[in-house]
Design a protein with these regions (language model features):
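Short, flexible/disordered secondary-structure transition segments
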Residues: 40, 75, 96, 149-150
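C-terminal interaction surface of TIR/SEFIR-family domains
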Residues: 1-12, 20-24, 103-166
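Disulfide-bonded cysteines in secreted/extracellular proteins and peptides
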Residues: 13-15, 78, 88, 124
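Amphipathic helical hotspot of TIR/SEFIR-family domains
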Residues: 56, 60, 67-109, 117-118
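Conserved N-terminal substructure of TIR/SEFIR domains
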Residues: 1-63, 94
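Structured beta-strand/turn binding interfaces of compact recognition modules in eukaryotic regulators
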Residues: 15-19, 36, 43-45, 67-70, ...
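A general alpha-helical scaffold signature found inside nucleotide-binding enzyme cores
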Residues: 28, 80-83, 130, 134
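Alpha-helix boundary recognition
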Residues: 34, 59, 86, 140-143
């Protein structure tokens, strides 16, 4: 078991859509953080940690980085994770850092675009209306947070700046 520093098991909880970013941006960010001794939790979306265990891991993390990619909102798993992060971080003075990866933050804010991305879930999970409302609200909340808009290939600069900040 990892040692606790300042009451946290992890310095960073990394949330992302594996198919979009795991092999490049998220993987490189994870390695850059780890190489600098920053304790980072990375769930590659393949393990699909159960909800309780994942929520506990979020609670045990000081900071969350949410890598919002073009298909992040098409994953119900990612949206539920996002809602859990925002619920857990609310009122606990924990940082949430959204990273808009190869997409414009206004696309996340846009009800039309968000509606299109979440349309798949509305059709499949019509009986989970409360869950969908919660995840849609979380998506709008994260879009309003200050974060990083990366779509110009300067990812190494982001890794360095974030690691220096941590």
């Amino acid at each position: 078991m990892a040692s606790l520093t300042n009451g946290f098991k992890y310095d960073v909880f990394l949330s992302f859509k594996a198919e979009d970013t795991a092999s490049d941006f998220a993987g490189n960010l994870y390695n850059a953080l780890k190489d600098r001794g920053i304790r980072t939790f990375m769930d590659d979306n393949k393990k699909r940690e159960n909800g309780e265990k994942l929520f506990k891991t979020i609670e045990e993390s000081k900071t969350a980085i949410i890598v919002l990619s073009k298909s992040y909102a098409s994953s119900l798993f990612c949206l539920e994770q996002l809602a859990s992060i925002l619920d857990c971080m609310k009122g606990k003075r924990k940082l949430v850092w959204p990273v808009f990866y190869n997409m414009d933050p206004s696309n996340v804010r846009s009800k039309t675009r968000t509606g299109k991305l979440m349309g798949v879930h509305k059709a499949w999970f019509n009986h989970y209306k409360n869950s969908l409302k919660k995840t849609k609200k979380a998506l709008h909340q994260v879009a309003d947070l200050s974060g990083f808009h990366l779509n110009n290939g300067y990812y190494a600069v982001f890794y360095l700046l974030f690691c220096v900040y941590m």
